[in-house]
Every structure is written in structure tokens, then in C-alpha cells.
């Protein structure tokens, strides 16, 4: 991507990371990117989400580069590039942008919010927002801005935390404003996009998440902040029989996209939409 062809509002640092000239506040823990960088390559959750996203892109391919908006440490961006889909990391967190550029060797990294970068209209072929929109209070305005920068019939790939009844302390700590279902996604996108595929995944985690996270939060007995050791266990970073079983179950979910099928339960929602003309 030739950044100067789509915006003039940037500076470039010694690592080659592009920075916008100003930066808005974001609803995300300041240490979040470094926290998850320690887990991503070992986590069955991040692995399965990546596999799901990749199958979505394969089935509904873009017609150009994918702008990975709010892409954190570039975990998804790196996988897309490795699989032959050109992608650019757009991440407002300094540590995430650095991890993506220096540690994951991504060719194009922009440290900015979408709003602050002020991209030109219809300058982007496709966009991905993977667990991003829930961090934005005025998500309707954000979706409008994404539609503005996308080319006609440009593809939008989304993952979002699903089912408001799964709301827990993890959502609060992570800076989420909401979780989503079919209706809320449709209402959010209908003005600018046509939804061409929607499904839920991580189905086998729905009941455990409710019993271990959502229910204790509702009862007021779970307010602790997550730590690396806790997350290593929850993300299966240390392996084990149960983790292997979960991986097998989750791998079967990936066939849903290959077969064009969908399901109505799961802790995360995947959406593929196309910009309206």
C-alpha cells in the first residue's frame, strides 16, 4: 500500500511505522497488546479465530489489500499475508504497532485510529475489524467511516464478542461497550452494507464462559483483573488432554465456512459484508 496515495496525514519513524499526526483516546487497556503478545502464538483461541478468519477470506475473497483495523500485534495480519492475501496493519497502540512491525516483520504498519488517519474516500479495497467494534462507543459512526473509505462493493470482515448474556468482568476490563447478536449486527450494518454471511463460533465455550465468567459477574463475586498466568491456562498455552480435545472440537467448526453453513450459538460472531453501491 502506498500510504501517501490515500492520506497526507502521517509521519514515519525509524522502524518504518507510519504515525498519524494526532491520536484519539481508545477504549482498550494500555498494556493489552503486550499482554496478549505473550499468548497469541500459544493460544488455541487465537489460533482458531485465525483459522476461521482465513476460511472466510478464502470463501469471500477481497479484490485488493485488506486494511486490518485495530489489528493489535498483527497476529491476523501476519497470517493473511503468509496465506497470500496482502494486508496492512492499522493499530493505534504504540506497542502493538511496534510488535507488528519489528517482531512480526509486517511490511506495512500504521499507528493510528481510523478517524485520525483521515483516509481518502473509496481508497481501500477491503477492511477487517477483528474484535474491534465492541471497543467503540459510537460504533455506528465508526461503521460509516469504514464504509466511506471502502471502494464500491468493498469487503468487510468482522469478528465480535457475542451474546449479551455472556457479559462478564472480562468485557469490563477489556474496554467493551457491548456484545452482539444477529439483530444488533444487522441494525449496525444495514445502512451501508449487505451482510452476505453470518455465523457464530467457539460454540463449545458458551456454557463454560457463562458458568465461569458471566454468572459469577452477575452475582457480584468475580471482579478480578486477568493476569498472564490465568490467561495462559484459559487459552491452553500449556497444552494438555483437555486442550487437545477442545482443539479437535473447534477444528470441526471451521468446516462450516467451507460448506457455506452457519450456526446460531457461540461466544464470537463472524460477519462478512459487502459495501452497498
Residue ranges and their predicted role:
Residues 130-133, 159:
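Residues lining the SAM
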Residues 61, 82, 137, 151, ...:
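Short conserved AdoMet
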Residues 136-140, 160:
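A structural helix-start
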Residues 193-204:
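Conserved S-adenosyl-L-methionine
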Residues 140-155:
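A short glycine-rich, Lys/Arg-flanked "PGG" loop and its adjoining helix->strand segment in the class I
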Residues 208-248:
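C-terminal helical/coil "lid" or tail adjacent to the Rossmann-like core of SAM-dependent
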Residues 1-122, 126-130, 140-143, 235-244, ...:
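Conserved N-terminal segment of class I S-adenosyl-L-methionine
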Residues 37-39, 156-188, 212:
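Short, glycine-/aromatic-enriched active-site segment of Class I SAM-dependent methyltransferases
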Amino acid at each position: 500500500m502506498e500510504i501517501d496515495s490515500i492520506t497526507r496525514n502521517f509521519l514515519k519513524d525509524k522502524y518504518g511505522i507510519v504515525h498519524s499526526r494526532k491520536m484519539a483516546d481508545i477504549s482498550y487497556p494500555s498494556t493489552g497488546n503486550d499482554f496478549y503478545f505473550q499468548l497469541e502464538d500459544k493460544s488455541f483461541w487465537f489460533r482458531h479465530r485465525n483459522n476461521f478468519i482465513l476460511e472466510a477470506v478464502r470463501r469471500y475473497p477481497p479484490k485488493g489489500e485488506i486494511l486490518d483495523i485495530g489489528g493489535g500485534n498483527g497476529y491476523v495480519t501476519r497470517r493473511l499475508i503468509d496465506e497470500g492475501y496482502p494486508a496492512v496493519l492499522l493499530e493505534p497502540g504504540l506497542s502493538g504497532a511496534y510488535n507488528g512491525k519489528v517482531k512480526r516483520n509486517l511490511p506495512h504498519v500504521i499507528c493510528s485510529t481510523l478517524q485520525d488517519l483521515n483516509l481518502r474516500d473509496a481508497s481501500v479495497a477491503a477492511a477487517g475489524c477483528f474484535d474491534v467494534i465492541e471497543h467503540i462507543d459510537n460504533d455506528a459512526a465508526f461503521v460509516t467511516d469504514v464504509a466511506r473509505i471502502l471502494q464500491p462493493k468493498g469487503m468487510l470482515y468482522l469478528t465480535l464478542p457475542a451474546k449479551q448474556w455472556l457479559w462478564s468482568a472480562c468485557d469490563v476490563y477489556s474496554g467493551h461497550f457491548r456484545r452482539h447478536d444477529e439483530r444488533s449486527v444487522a441494525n449496525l450494518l444495514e445502512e451501508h452494507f449487505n451482510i452476505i454471511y453470518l455465523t457464530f463460533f467457539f460454540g463449545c465455550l458458551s456454557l463454560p464462559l457463562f458458568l465461569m465468567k458471566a454468572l459469577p459477574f452477575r452475582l457480584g463475586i468475580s471482579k478480578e483483573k486477568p493476569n498472564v498466568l490465568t490467561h495462559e491456562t484459559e487459552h491452553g498455552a500449556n497444552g494438555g488432554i483437555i486442550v487437545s480435545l477442545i482443539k479437535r472440537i473447534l477444528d470441526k467448526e471451521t468446516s462450516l465456512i467451507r460448506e457455506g453453513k452457519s450456526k446460531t450459538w457461540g461466544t464470537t460472531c463472524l460477519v462478512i459484508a459487502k459495501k452497498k453501491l
